[in-house]
Design a protein with these regions (language model features):
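Conserved acyl-donor/pantetheine-binding loop and adjacent beta-alpha core of acyl/acetyltransferases
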Residues: 46-106, 112-120
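Conserved GNAT acetyl-CoA-binding A-motif
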Residues: 98-103, 134-149, 177
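Short hydrophobic/aromatic beta-strand or adjacent loop that forms the aromatic wall/cage
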Residues: 23, 101, 175-182
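Conserved active-site alpha-helix within GNAT-family acetyltransferase domains
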Residues: 150-168, 173
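Conserved beta-hairpin
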Residues: 22-42
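Short loop/turn motifs at secondary-structure junctions and domain boundaries
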Residues: 16-21
Length: 186
C-alpha cells in the first residue's frame, strides 16, 4: 500500500485505521528520537474489506486529491488485487478464527547499523516484531503472517530466528515477488 503514496499513508492508513480498531502498532524511540514503527492487525483476512466499507468516501477523497503517478496507479491496482484475492470475511457465529498480520515495519538505518546494535545492545527491529507478536498472543490468535519481499534475505533471517516459517513463495494478489511467513502464538 505504500506505493499509493505518503499522503494516503499519513492521512488515512496510519491515522484513521488505528482509531477505528482496524490496525494496532507502535513507534520505538531511542534517546528521544523516533527509531522505528510497526503496524499490524488482528484480522488479516478482513481488515482491508472492513476498512474499505467503513471509509468509502474518505478513501475516495484521499485518492482523488492525490496526484496520479505510475507508482500510485500500480499501488491502487495491487490493493484492488489484494481485496479480490483475500479470504472473504466470515459470517458472524462461524468458527473461522481470525489471523494476525504484521503489515508494515520500518527502522531508520542508523538504528539498524551494526555499530548501533553492538554499542547499545538495542535491536529496535526485533523489539518491534516481538511487541506485535505479544499483541497476537494476547488476542489469543492461532496464527499470524507477514509478507516479505522475496529478495529481502536479511529480514527473512530475522523472522526465522524469531520462530516464523515460510509458507508460500508466491503470494496471490501481490505484484512484487514475495514470501509469506507464518507464526503460531500458541
Amino acid at each position: 500500500l505504500s506505493k499509493i503514496g505518503t499522503s494516503f499513508m499519513r492521512r488515512f492508513y496510519y491515522n484513521v485505521l488505528p482509531r477505528q480498531g482496524h490496525l494496532f502498532g507502535a513507534v520505538a524511540y531511542v534517546g528521544g528520537q523516533a527509531a522505528g514503527f510497526i503496524s499490524a492487525t488482528h484480522d488479516s483476512d478482513g481488515y482491508m474489506r472492513r476498512a474499505f466499507r467503513d471509509n468509502l468516501f474518505r478513501i475516495a477523497f484521499v485518492a482523488g486529491t492525490s496526484i496520479p503517478t505510475p507508482r500510485r496507479i500500480e499501488g491502487y491496482r495491487e490493493a484492488a488485487g489484494l481485496l479480490r484475492g483475500s479470504t472473504p470475511v466470515p459470517a458472524k457465529g462461524t468458527d473461522t478464527a481470525p489471523k494476525g498480520e504484521i503489515l508494515s515495519i520500518g527502522v531508520r538505518s542508523s538504528f539498524r547499523s551494526f555499530e548501533f546494535l553492538s554499542t547499545t545492545g538495542i535491536d529496535v527491529y526485533k523489539d518491534l516484531i516481538e511487541g506485535a507478536m505479544d499483541g497476537f498472543r494476547e488476542a489469543n490468535l492461532e496464527e499470524a503472517r507477514i509478507i516479505v519481499d522475496s529478495d529481502d534475505i536479511e529480514n527473512q533471517g530475522v523472522y526465522r530466528r524469531l520462530g516464523w516459517r515460510p509458507r508460500q513463495s508466491a503470494v496471490p494478489g501481490w505484484f512484487t515477488p514475495s514470501t509469506e511467513f507464518i507464526w503460531n502464538p500458541r
